[in-house]
Amino acid sequence: MLLYRLLTTLFAAVVLGRLVLGRSFGDLRARLALGPAEPGHHLWLHAASNGELASARPLIEALRIARPDLALVVTCNSVTGVALAQSWGLPARLAPLDLGWVTRRFLRNWSVRAHLAMESELWPHRVLGCPGPVLIMGGRLSERTARAWRLFGGLQRRLLARIHWLSAQDEGSLARYLAAGLPADAAGPVVDLKALYDPPDLHDATLSGLNRDHTWLAASTHEGEEETALTAHLVARAQEPELRLILAPRHPRRADDIVRLANAKGLTVARRSLGEAPDADVYLADTLGEMALFYAAAGRVFIGGTLADRGGHTPYEPAACGAALIHGPDVRNFRAPFARLDAAGAACAIDSAETLAAALLALHPRQRAMGQAARALLRPRMDAQALVAGISARLDTLTPA
């Protein structure tokens, strides 16, 4: 614990210094748990990113319906995550730094009675300081992280001994949690939160003119992947003239660079952020929070991060929308679902612009069948209501009065 305290103190100093230099004083107050709190006892729910929070939404909504007596407070590591939670009508704050005195202030101010963390967000001061049960949903523990934990000696076992319920997102993670010290009676069902994704029933007038059978999406792309996507689009379009590309970069701030790249290849670009109609060669989806719209508009989806050494992004959301899936070789973040998809012929692996173009053309006549197969294959084995029933039972048993 001494080593962890030293490292977190150094990290906190860096974070606080950046906030002060950037004059982000509102963020600074939030990171120190100095902001206003709402009255009453709370269940503290933490999700690191927008993606984790969005994946948790079915669980959150089911929890709000099943347990109206439980007031929620949500924390995230980004202001966009906070804004997303607030748009759902939830009190949300930037996550407090994991320093003992800061965590104690947050727990006291919000009168926290239990803590529910998403995925790998296992912070020692939160886990050890929470007065009630600590639950983990969608826990992920890679082999690399499990090895790193050993650097902290007995801290990992102290933390895991305080976990009252943990639902791992895959069997490998569960085995590693148990080997690291998770009590056997705390092991919940194996469920990937992202599998709970239920596509919203959305309509967008701007996209309604696109023919889904002749539209493909390069989703959550990273630098280098746009080059591949644009080159593949040019090659495939020569044989499928109606083909349209929606290009949705992981970081919309890179939009100007992507426009220049496309123009250099002789492609015209329409930008979503400027309200332009998707009648150009490429429709640049340079906005945040609208990926569900783009999944619904495309019959074929290339999943970004799989060619850029990023481990790949989620296959669950495009699969739930019934899209035929294409991915590169780096799928380590979702190794198990991609293996199932590939084995069933519900996804196609590529490694270059040439193989991406070939996949786009080969998948066109069977994209609907592939999309239906992907949707069926990744359908969750347990719904959000069943998970909430398990969580609620633990809260009823363990939460102090």
Q: What residue ranges belong to the model's regions?
A:
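Conserved sugar-transfer catalytic core signal across GT-A, GT-B, and GT-C glycosyltransferases
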Residues: 126, 225, 290, 313-314, ...
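Catalytic binding pocket for nucleotide-activated donors in carbohydrate/polymer assembly enzymes
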Residues: 163, 296-368, 377
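Donor-nucleotide binding loops and adjacent catalytic segments primarily
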Residues: 58, 62, 75-78, 224-291
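A transmembrane-helix-recognition feature enriched in membrane-embedded lipid enzymes
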Residues: 1-28
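Charged active-site motifs of nucleotide-sugar-dependent glycosyltransferases
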Residues: 39-44, 211-216, 226-228, 242-244
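Acidic donor-binding loop of glycosyltransferase active sites
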Residues: 110-114, 279-310
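Active-site and donor-binding regions of nucleotide-sugar-utilizing enzymes
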Residues: 19-32, 36-202, 221-223, 236-241, ...
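C-terminal alpha-helical cap of glycosyltransferases
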Residues: 380-401
